[in-house]
Structures are given as structure tokens and as C-alpha cells.
Regions:
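Flexible phosphate-sensing "switch/lid" loops adjacent to ATP/NTP-binding sites
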Residues: 1-174, 189-351, 355-356, 363-365, ...
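Short HxH-centered metal-ligating active-site micro-motif
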Residues: 390-422
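Residue-level structural signal for beta-strand termini and adjacent loop
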Residues: 201, 373-375
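Hydrophobic positions on the alpha1 helix immediately C-terminal to the Walker A/P-loop
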Residues: 185
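A short, polar/charged loop-to-alpha-helix boundary motif
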Residues: 376-392
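The conserved Walker
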Residues: 177-178
Length: 498
């Protein structure tokens, strides 16, 4: 793996900068943690070398003075929004996050449900959490937000929200994903704290967009692709340009909310400590890029991956045409096409020859392998076996799983479990070679290569089952699929790992 990001430097200078910001405020600091506190796989993909739990490591250094508030939007609860990298809904991820934080000794005292307008699903979720002993608060949608500053900064605006009880000087506000309303929760709390005579401050810790990279740098374009469903747009921060004469990149929601922030600080302090949305942030990631070209290329690949995710979601009714169009436009800005993904090209070339579902993998060393569907194996399962054999130095013609073993598995799947697809999935072939490894050295060698698949890139010419998607995800393999449900076989095929 080529590294483009210095994670050790990042941990050092980022934690120092956060501590400096905390010291500038008095009684309490609300810090909005954008992105993900851990499992930040997007950052690790576009900034090779960034560790997914880097933010958590920094927070652990301040855990005695910090508590966490988790935010979830009632809108996301209502539509069962999925966290794509983990395959679980946001409402389930709130509980997962809470458990993860508490297991590390961090204090998590409450959950805030934002954008609440009486949704039955949100009310049911609140009852469920309260039944588990979790304190839950409602924050309502405010008409005209974020532009109607007079209403927002009043008892009819933030004043209608529940006051979130906190006890520590540092309050970290986080969420399962973007668009949950973290900033609004922080601002509401500043208003509520001021009413109670408490001088509270606000800061923002968000990795993307990286403010000191160019507007159309692939790293920043990849952030727009990741948030296409939120209609976020990166832009030059006009306030920063006016105050300092320097160009800085921010995104539209921060720029839109800045007048509200200024008005709130004027009420609390009599002045605003920030001259621009960029000033509110504490992001030091841009100073830790060690190889710009590596990060550019990784980000371009991420944009392509997001494009395929969007078109597959659109085919399943889970995304809008506007989301697809936006990412397509970002690809043009980055001067890339789907042909810039090598596994995609290889899979489609194999499809033209075989006229059946195919898949291709690009390994970390640049090697490309392909596979197609057969009567015994799906293309992803066959591809996985091919990759393991290659990495283990096992000749291609060697069959890791005897046909005599596959046949009874298929019989069970179809005759007894009443499945429609007799072909083995990726998890089933892994279980099979795990069993055989007790008596077969080749299977043992193949299994030992599983960790070496991390970072590989796969493309499938058909949309995969949830089982196969999760298997690739657990192995750390990047996956893209064409928005096709099934390819009819033009010729009958025998079992083959090829």
C-alpha cells in the first residue's frame, strides 16, 4: 500500500490544536465532531495512511473531561437510513456507537433526536431507548432555519428545544453520519446555556472538506461525492476571504449557518470570537498529507466507487437521479471515467467473452484476476478462490473445493432450505475451505492469505447479494457493481474456478 498521509504527525498536531481551542473558552465547550469518531473508512480511503480510529485516539486523551452526546435525525429514523460502510441502520448505529464509546470508558449520557415533528417512528425509538435507561431529548425543526436568525435565536426557535443536561467541560456532539443536525444541537445548547448563565463555546472538528486544499482537489471532490444525498456543496469561504484575504474551502451548510453563529455569540459574549466558518474548525489534516499524488489518485478511485454505489442504489429505489447526476458531474471535474477503475475494465472485458456474470479483482500488487459464474459457484465466490490461490502460489488448475463436496451443499440450499440460487456464495466457500484445511495443505495456505486481500478492489457486472457484499467489506475489499440484477447465461457452464 502506498501511503500519502502521516498519521503520527496528525495525532500530535491535531490533539494539540484541539486542546488550545478548549483553553480559549470558559465554562464549557461544545465540539461538533463531523464525520465518524471511529470507523472513518472514507478518510482512510482518500488519505491512505489515515487510521480509521484516529479521532477516537485523540478523544481518549481527554476522556476525563469529556462526555458524548449522540445525535440522530427523525428523518433518518423514518426512512431507515443505512450506514453504507457497515450495512446497518442509523438507529441501530446509535446503540452501537454508544456501546463502543462506553466500552472505552467514555461517558455517553444522552441521545438527541433532531428534526422532530411528531414522527411516530421517532416517538417509538425514544420509548425504546428510554426503556434501556438512555436519556433522550427532542430538537424540533425551526421554520426558516438557518436564515431566519431572529426566530432561531429566540424562545420560539432554539428555546423550544429540550435542554440537554451535561456535566463535563467538553461536550462532544457526534452522529452516525452527516446531515443529522449536530451543529444545530450545539447552537441550541449555546442558547440554552446562556439562558442559564453558563458561558459555553463552540468548535468544529471535521476532516472534510480540507480547508487548505484547493476547492477542486480530488480529496474535497470525494467529500462531495460522499454527501451527494445531502446536496452539500464545497465552496470558497467568503467570510474568510473577506477577513484575511486568504482562500479557504468550506461547505455550504457551514457558510449558511455562520450568521446565526455570529448572532448567538453577540448575544452571549457581546462579540463573535470567529471571523469565518473556517475559523470555527480545528482541522489539521491538510498539514499531514505526505504524498499529494497518492491522495489524489485514492480520492479519484473513491469518487468512482461512490458513483457505482449511487447508480446501484438508484436501481433499487434508494437514491435519486439527482444524486447520480451530481457524482457524474464530480467525475467530470476530476477528469475521470469508470474506465479509470482497472477491475471494472477487466470484469467487462470478461463479460464480453463469457456472456455471463463476471467479476474482477485488482490486488495490492496490481495483479488483475477475473472469474465468471458457473453451475456451482457465483462469480464472486470463484473470484475469491482465484485470488487466494494466486496469493498462496497454488496453481490455477487446482480445485480447492471438490465438486463432490459442493453438490450436497447445493442440495441442502435448494431442496431443504428452499433457496432459488444453488451457487455457493463467498461466505460459503470460505467456510468450506476452512473445513477442508484440516486435511488439505492447499486450503490452509489459501486461508492464510485472507489478510492480504485487504485493500484489493473488486468489480462485479451484477449487483451482489447482501451476504457477498458484507463478506467483501469484512475482508477490507473495495467493491463496485454494475446496476444489473441478473445476466442470463447464453451457454451452459460447468463448475470452474477461473
Amino acid at each position: 500500500m502506498k501511503y500519502g498521509f502521516d498519521n503520527e504527525k496528525y495525532l500530535k498536531i491535531q490533539s494539540e490544536h484541539i486542546k488550545q481551542r478548549i483553553a480559549t473558552f470558559g465554562d464549557k465547550l461544545y465540539m461538533e465532531f463531523g464525520g465518524k469518531l471511529f470507523d472513518d473508512f472514507h478518510a482512510s480511503r482518500v488519505l491512505p495512511g489515515f487510521e480509521p480510529d484516529s479521532k477516537l485516539k485523540m478523544l481518549m486523551q481527554m476522556k476525563d473531561d469529556a462526555e458524548i452526546v449522540i445525535v440522530i435525525s427523525a428523518l433518518d429514523i423514518e426512512k431507515n437510513k443505512i450506514r453504507s460502510d457497515l450495512g446497518i441502520t442509523y438507529d441501530m448505529d446509535v446503540l452501537r456507537l454508544r456501546d463502543e464509546f462506553m466500552d472505552r470508558g467514555l461517558s455517553v449520557n444522552s441521545v438527541v433526536i433532531t428534526h422532530f415533528n411528531g414522527q411516530a417512528s421517532a416517538e417509538a425509538y425514544r420509548k425504546r431507548l428510554e426503556g434501556m435507561g438512555i436519556q433522550v431529548y427532542y430538537h424540533h425543526t425551526i421554520e426558516g432555519y438557518p436564515h431566519n436568525v431572529a426566530l432561531i435565536d429566540s424562545d420560539e426557535g432554539f428555546g423550544k428545544n429540550d435542554y440537554v443536561e451535561t456535566t463535563k467541560p467538553l461536550v462532544v456532539v457526534t452522529a452516525p453520519g452527516p446531515g443529522s443536525g449536530k451543529m444545530a444541537v450545539c447552537l441550541s445548547q449555546l442558547y440554552q446555556e446562556n439562558k442559564r448563565g453558563i458561558k459555553a463555546g463552540y468548535a468544529k472538528f471535521e476532516t472534510f472538506p480540507i480547508w487548505n486544499l484547493p476547492l477542486n482537489h480530488p480529496v474535497n471532490l470525494a467529500y462531495e461525492a460522499a454527501t451527494a444525498d445531502l446536496e452539500d456543496v464545497n465552496m470558497i469561504d467568503p467570510f474568510h476571504l473577506d477577513a484575511y484575504g486568504e482562500t479557504a474551502v468550506n461547505y455550504n451548510r457551514d457558510v449558511e449557518i455562520f450568521p446565526v453563529m455570529n448572532a448567538l455569540f453577540d448575544d452571549i459574549y457581546g462579540f463573535s470570537p470567529y471571523k469565518s466558518p473556517t475559523d470555527m474548525g480545528v482541522n489539521m489534516a491538510g498539514y499531514c498529507i505526505s504524498d499529494d499524488e497518492v491522495c489524489r489518485e485514492a480520492s479519484k478511485q473513491e469518487i468512482i466507487r461512490r458513483y457505482y454505489t449511487a447508480i446501484c442504489n438508484f436501481a433499487e429505489g434508494k437514491a435519486t437521479e439527482a444524486e447520480v447526476a451530481k457524482i457524474a458531474l464530480l467525475m467530470k471535474k476530476a477528469k475521470i471515467t469508470t474506465d479509470d477503475r482497472r477491475s471494472t475494465v477487466a470484469a467487462k472485458e470478461r463479460l464480453e467473452k463469457s456472456q455471463s456474470a463476471t467479476a474482477a479483482i485488482e490486488l495490492e500488487d496490481g495483479t488483475i484476476l477475473t472469474a465468471e459464474t458457473s453451475s456451482l459457484l457465483g462469480p464472486s465466490a470463484a473470484l475469491l478462490l482465484n485470488a487466494l490461490k494466486y496469493l498462496a502460489g497454488i496453481p490455477h488448475y487446482v480445485k480447492l473445493i471438490p465438486q463432490t463436496m459442493i453438490a450436497p451443499i447445493q442440495k441442502t440450499k435448494v431442496n431443504y432450505l428452499h433457496g432459488h440460487n444453488p451457487r455457493l456464495h463467498t461466505d460459503e466457500v470460505l467456510v468450506s475451505i476452512s473445513i477442508i484445511s484440516l486435511i488439505d495443505e492447499n486450503c490452509k495456505l489459501a486461508l492464510d492469505q485472507l489478510p492480504n486481500l485487504k485493500g484489493a478492489q473488486v468489480h462485479s457486472t451484477v449487483m451482489l447479494s447482501e451476504v457477498d457484499r458484507k463478506t467483501f467489506n469484512k475482508l477490507g475489499i473495495g467493491l463496485t457493481c454494475d446496476p444489473v440484477r441478473k445476466i442470463k447465461h447464453l451457454r451452459k457452464k460447468e463448475a470452474e474456478e477461473e
